[in-house]
């Protein structure tokens, strides 16, 4: 009983961590913005023209994907937390339910963890390009240093959320295959009992 309680608590804490970390990454990305000024050399003009620009997540498709993915992971984690709490209060023997629920959790957790990992990888690549630049992409962090610094926090939260989501997916897969083995063992026991019952008949 104590072991079951510890497993439930660990899974709940991991889901809670994934939810808050992905939500933090989402909010930081969406709310982060900075106004910057940079000069443009125009042919024929004696002096460069000073131009104002605003950096936010809507300027790059990768940032939109990152924000959307973090929102999906946070929403999914909240849904699973609600289901888990309902399962605990109802006195269900397992936080992941029966075979069908275990399959749904397994597929959902694997999808969420891979989506979170993909979003974290995209954010890391964008952070690198913003800092170092590329042949066709200037180092925008030169002009928007505060924006890049704050976005770095979102990248850290995204990777921590990925770690929590992967641990949740590992627990879900372990439970699913363990449940599958238990069900197979129960079926074999029923068959043996049926065979013994048939043999005992005169």
Swiss-Prot record:
InterPro entries: CASP/CASPL, CASP_dom
Protein's UniProt keywords contain Cell membrane: yes
Localization: Cell membrane
One of the record's GO cellular component terms: plasma membrane
Residues in compartment: Cytoplasmic: 1-10, 86-101, 170-202
The keyword RNA-binding belongs to this UniProt entry's keyword annotation: no
Extracellular side: 32-64, 123-148
Disulphide bridges, residue numbers: none
Family in the record: Belongs to the Casparian strip membrane proteins (CASP) family.
Subunit and partners: Homodimer and heterodimers.
Name of the protein this chain belongs to: CASP-like protein 2U7
Annotated source species: Selaginella moellendorffii (Spikemoss)
Lineage of origin: Eukaryota, Viridiplantae, Streptophyta, Embryophyta, Tracheophyta
């Amino acid at each position: 009983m104590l072991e079951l309680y510890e497993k439930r608590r660990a899974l709940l804490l991991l889901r809670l961590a994934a939810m808050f970390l992905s939500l933090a990454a989402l909010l930081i990305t969406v709310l982060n913005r900075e106004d910057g000024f940079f000069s443009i050399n125009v042919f024929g003009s004696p002096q460069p023209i000073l131009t104002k620009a605003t950096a936010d997540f809507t300027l790059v498709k990768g940032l939109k994907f990152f924000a959307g993915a973090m929102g999906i992971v946070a929403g999914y984690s909240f849904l699973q937390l609600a289901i888990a709490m309902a399962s605990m209060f109802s006195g269900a023997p397992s936080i992941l339910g029966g075979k069908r629920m275990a399959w749904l959790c397994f597929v959902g957790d694997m999808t969420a963890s891979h989506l979170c990992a993909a979003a974290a990888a995209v954010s890391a690549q964008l952070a690198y390009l913003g800092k170092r630049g590329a042949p066709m992409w200037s180092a925008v962090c030169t002009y928007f240093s505060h924006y890049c610094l704050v976005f770095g926090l979102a990248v850290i939260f995204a990777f921590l959320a990925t770690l929590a989501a992967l641990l949740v997916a590992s627990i879900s897969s372990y439970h699913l295959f363990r449940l599958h083995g238990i069900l197979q063992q129960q079926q074999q026991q029923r068959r043996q009992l049926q065979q013994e019952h048939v043999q005992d008949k005169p």
